[in-house]
Amino acid sequence: PAVYAGKDGYGLSLAAVGFVLMLTRFSDVVTDPLIGFISDRTRTRWGRRKPFIFIGTPVYALGIWLLFINPIEFREVTWLGLEFNIGYPYLFFSLALVYLGATIKDLPYRAWGAELSSNYNERTIITSWREAFGVTGALISAFTPAIIFFLGYTRPIDAVFYLSAAMLIIMPILTLNTLIVCPEYPVRERVQTRIPLIESVKLVFRNKIYVRYIVIFTFSGIGSAMTNALSFFFVEHVLVAGALYGFYLAPYFLSQIVSIPVWFKLSAKVGKHRATMFAIGWYAFWASWIPLIAIAPNEWFDAFQVHVILGFLPQAWYETIVSQFEGIETGKFLFFIVVMCLKGSSIGALAALPQSMAADIIDVDTRTSGQQRAGAYFAIGGMIGKGAAALGLFVGTSLAVLGGFDQLADPENTTNTAETLLWLACVYSVIPALFKFVAMPFLWNWPLTEAKLHEIQSEIFESPGNKKVENAYSS
């Protein structure tokens, strides 16, 4: 939203951009189950999952190029008597291409990860490492706005241009390395007759523990999307530090990486569901501080001013660095970073642990259906998750606009009232935390513990007719 609706971006309507982003997600209703279903049925010499990742990567890259390295100029046009900005349909089609590529490559990728191990805690290690590398990529990308800030580029549109260009070069190299180095292991199946698509979807939703998981996943996704959609606008308009946004992202992502081993140890000790509950509580506690930061006077945060914190540096270094922040209120912003790092330390757990729990749930289906259908499960989960993200983005931007927020206002001489900015802070932090709290009663007494999973896997292994399904194509 900051690129397409921000005052330093394309200047489109925030509410309309949010609606377009939500609308594009409807394409996943068809593509997600279809890709998951086909991926489960595929047999090639390279495996079930790798061909889709190989095909989806260039589709995704093309979509990113069109979305962020815009080759056309947006303008008002008239078509069939309707006047609108060409930016809206352009956003829709380029984003739909991004989502299509992401579906083709990401769903088999996640299913592949679920099949790498059957061990309760080892699955958490796999998803934790995957999320850690994902956040590392986000961390590297977060340094881009910080670096180009010193080169005079402060707009979000500048940052995404350089990030997209770098990604288009690096992503194919890393993807190819993964496809060559990482193995696909044969899966164990009892039933060789393939289940039709519609029946396959029905069987997924008959898995009661998966439906329970989906409720948790959906509400958490809505909350996360609300926060992500409004993050830049909060920093720009409430903290009046939009030029420093890149400096916030880097430590925020770093806190997620550093905390992952802590959450893994807690998960191994108390179980994945209990650790997830702790993470939600930790997230909500620090989220409640955000509105207080928004309404507190700047004088309260003088101890966090850059010129105070960096006073120990040599004079030449000190003057060079401090001059870059001249005219910017850094005290409240740096205190905000501290709070967000504490809050962000829970994000790694909220990403890795549910994915590991999903891998466990698939074993319940394998015991019942006799087939390893990770693709179908991650496809349906991905479809619902994307829908939740789109809904959260739409709800977040709409609530902000309904509260009177104008994203095009000058932050230095804003027309947004104090009440409007406080409302923006609540929509950005407190309301998303409440959405995540919906998961608590569903996680309490979660039935799929380590002991229960071991029992289920023993039944799968010992069941009559169970055998490995090799990667070579077979009809």
Regions found by a protein language model. Give the residues of each.
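Membrane-embedded alpha-helical bundles of multi-pass transporters/translocases
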Residues: 1-475
